[in-house]
UniProtKB/Swiss-Prot annotation:
Belongs to the ferredoxin--NADP reductase type 2 family. It comes from Geobacillus kaustophilus (strain HTA426). The keyword Zinc does not apply. Its EC number is 1.18.1.2. Keywords: FAD, Flavoprotein, NADP, Oxidoreductase. Homodimer. It holds the Pfam family Pyr_redox_2. Gene3D superfamilies: FAD/NAD(P)-binding domain (3.50.50.60). It catalyses: 2 reduced [2Fe-2S]-[ferredoxin] + NADP(+) + H(+) = 2 oxidized [2Fe-2S]-[ferredoxin] + NADPH. It is an enzyme of class 1 (oxidoreductase). Binds 1 FAD per subunit. Transmembrane segments: none annotated. This is Ferredoxin--NADP reductase.
Length: 332
């Protein structure tokens, strides 16, 4: 199968579409750069959108509290002022500097070219731990969910949540007011979630099934209709009627191919200097993926690092450009 090739050479290509990457895309536009952003997930927003879109964040400057998905929506509106090219469902496999100084990025879908690269991949590419039942994959994209983007789709439905951590318990509690019924199944007697959340769960109408594991999905070509649960200790089985199944077994994250790009890596993070420069000229890193003395992993810090990385990339491309940009109030 031939791989598509985008021969356009961008000023900057951002690897990772989480909040830091999205703000970097906006800032690249602000500095009149041609920007592309590549994200491995089906949507922008990184872990905010994939793991806890309905949760509130309390440590973003200027927001006493902001729902995670709302922050993502605002970031998208902001970056769309400059219409960056967005590539979703693409994982970058190789990054290679060519003889002319430009970078060649090969993903699972196509080949890209860029004058500079900014890596904002958070904790690396992450994929959900999947339900290990033979027929599970055929229901992905139907009524078996690993990501939740819209709580409303579960309104009036019988929902089974699998898992015992914070995500499983939090989703169960958030679904309780809108779903017809919510059942949570966990293979252990005790939940790993925050104590306060577990207490709320006990007081709620959520049906708790412990220690059980799902062992079989019963359905047709359209959807799962029933889930068979097995008691971990006794081996007895129960059948539950469902309209939707949500699996929260956590995520597997790793730097993956990034480790093979010749970058200086320290404790699973990319080493950068005060200009967000890596050891490869023209390649920068920002957000949780990077490390330096005094590094703090916060969204707020990533928002500060993104403009530094962009401005460094700008001056790399054009040495006559100013590192210090003009204030945004004078640009619109």
């Amino acid at each position: 199968m031939s791989v598509k090739e985008d021969r356009n050479v961008y000023d900057v290509t951002i690897i990772g579409g989480g909040p830091t990457g999205m703000f970097a895309a906006f800032y690249g536009g602000l500095r009149q750069m041609k920007v592309k952003i590549i994200e491995s997930l089906p949507q922008l927003g990184g872990q905010l959108a994939a793991l806890y879109p309905e949760k509130y964040i309390y440590d973003v400057a200027g927001f006493p509290k902001v729902r995670a998905q709302e922050l993502v929506n605002q970031l998208k509106e902001q970056m769309d002022l400059f219409s960056p090219t967005v590539c979703l469902n693409e994982s970058v496999d190789t990054l290679e500097k060519q003889e002319d100084g430009t970078f060649k990025l090969v993903t699972n879908q196509q080949i890209h070219y860029s004058k500079t690269v900014i890596i904002t991949a958070g904790n690396g590419a992450f994929q959900p731990r999947r339900l290990e039942i033979e027929s599970a994959s055929r229901y992905e994209g139907k009524n078996l969910h690993y990501f939740i983007n819209d709580l409303g789709q579960f309104s009036g439905k019988r929902v089974l949540v699998c898992g015992g951590g914070d995500s499983a318990v939090d989703w169960s509690l958030m679904l309780e007011p809108i779903a017809q019924s919510v059942t949570i199944v966990h293979r252990r007697d005790k939940f790993r979630a925050h104590e306060h959340s577990v207490e709320q769960l006990k007081k709620s109408s959520v049906q708790v099934k412990t220690p059980f594991v799902p062992v079989e999905l019963v359905g047709d070509e359209h959807a799962i209709r029933q889930v068979i649960l097995e008691h971990v200790k006794e081996g007895t089985k129960e059948t539950i009627d469902v309209d939707a199944v949500i699996v929260n077994y956590g995520f597997i994250s790793s730097l993956g191919p990034i480790k093979n790009w010749g970058l200086d890596i320290e404790k699973n993070a990319i080493k950068v200097n005060s200009r967000m420069e890596t050891n490869i000229p023209g390649v920068y890193a920002a957000g949780d993926i990077c490390t330096y003395d005094g590094k703090i992993k916060l969204i707020a810090c990533g928002f500060g690092e993104a403009p530094i990385a962009i401005s460094s990339a700008k001056t790399y491309i054009d040495p006559t450009a100013r590192m210090q940009p003009a204030h945004s109030t004078s640009l619109f």
